Amino acid sequence: MTPEHLPTEQYEAQLAEKVVRLQSMMAPFSDLVPEVFRSPVSHYRMRAEFRIWHDGDDLYHIIFDQQTKSRIRVDSFPAASELINQLMTAMIAGVRNNPVLRHKLFQIDYLTTLSNQAVVSLLYHKKLDDEWRQQAEALRDALRAQNLNVHLIGRATKTKIELDQDYIDERLPVAGKEMIYRQVENSFTQPNAAMNIQMLEWALDVTKGSKGDLLELYCGNGNFSLALARNFDRVLATEIAKPSVAAAQYNIAANHIDNVQIIRMAAEEFTQAMNGVREFNRLQGIDLKSYQCETIFVDPPRSGLDSETEKMVQAYPRILYISCNPETLCKNLETLSQTHKVERLALFDQFPYTHHMECGVLLTAK
């Protein structure tokens, strides 16, 4: 695979290999055949980051070869959304001959939505001043004149300049309902929007007919919490990153959802609160004991669940686990399978043509 060519003719073969690999990894815990969810074969990534290489009067996007670490010039990137590809061309054209904007520019980050909005961040090894702002505003206006719905941000050490805003609002059709999700620059968002829709719809399907409340750890901008709210009486969700919590609160209001409560705390802290080990001021006014959480949802980082959280989630009759790293999922299942069995298993091809797999399991108490 090269940056400017995707082996689309190999898509089905690479997906089949992932199915076999996941089944093999899951064999100690389940003999289920995974439900398989396919990605678009190109233009599936809604965000991308590129270093900028200065070559005399020219400059261009580059990425680094993972094996050799050599730099590769990238003028188009078919894995990224069509809007990112349009912006890559337009940004280089707008910056190349502008001394203020190109000087000490070392990276450009792109974040886009299916609703055709974009935030583009320009990263510099220099101080940004009023002259930079004026030139950046002129570039933004020129991009908008090309019908590109874009917001620009300048970043340097201890500096962030937003020309308008640092977020965009995604609109996703999820099981017959449009969901609005505010996505903040430099915060985690699901990279493959088409796959995200399928993940949300699968999670809705496996939690149909649920009783009681839902607890979610690591909720981000509320991506899963808000979509799943319709299947539960109430949802209690935790998140540590301030921008994500703020986005989640906005998304609750934008989607007119009244049964979701977001708490800003780490999963480890929440475990302590639930077990009565510590009291937290952030939980004042929230009666944890009033929640009847029959289901817990976890979408942990690549490192998986820590041992204390493993023990905590085992107390719930149903565990819905989305994993971006099946190796740590299987490590967690060594513990979780002592008390729970795998009822549903799904493979989400979040990153085609790579070894990465995203998967989902529903576990029920034995």
UniProtKB/Swiss-Prot annotation:
Enzyme Commission number(s) of this protein: 2.1.1.-, 2.1.1.35
Gene Ontology cellular component annotations, sorted alphabetically: cytosol
Top EC class for this record: transferase
GO biological process: tRNA methylation
Catalyzed reaction equations: uridine(54) in tRNA + S-adenosyl-L-methionine = 5-methyluridine(54) in tRNA + S-adenosyl-L-homocysteine + H(+); uridine(341) in tmRNA + S-adenosyl-L-methionine = 5-methyluridine(341) in tmRNA + S-adenosyl-L-homocysteine + H(+)
InterPro entries hit by this protein: MeTrfase_TrmA_AS, MeTrfase_TrmA_CS, SAM-dependent_MTases_sf, TrmA_MeTrfase, U5_MeTrfase_fam
Catalytic site positions: C324, E358
Presence of keyword Electron transport: no
Binding sites annotated in the UniProt record for S-adenosyl-L-methionine: Q190, Y218, N223, E239, D299
Record key words, sorted: Methyltransferase, S-adenosyl-L-methionine, Transferase, tRNA processing
Coiled-coil positions: none
GO molecular function, one term: tRNA binding
Cysteines engaged in disulfide bonds, as pairs: none
NCBIfam families: trmA_only
Entry similarity comment: Belongs to the class I-like SAM-binding methyltransferase superfamily. RNA M5U methyltransferase family. TrmA subfamily.
PANTHER family per UniProt: TRNA/TMRNA (URACIL-C(5))-METHYLTRANSFERASE (PTHR47790), TRNA_TMRNA (URACIL-C(5))-METHYLTRANSFERASE (PTHR47790:SF2)
HAMAP family in alphabetical order: RNA_methyltr_TrmA
Reported function: Dual-specificity methyltransferase that catalyzes the formation of 5-methyluridine at position 54 (m5U54) in all tRNAs, and that of position 341 (m5U341) in tmRNA (transfer-mRNA).
Protein name per Swiss-Prot or TrEMBL: tRNA/tmRNA (uracil-C(5))-methyltransferase
Species per Swiss-Prot/TrEMBL record: Escherichia coli O127:H6 (strain E2348/69 / EPEC)
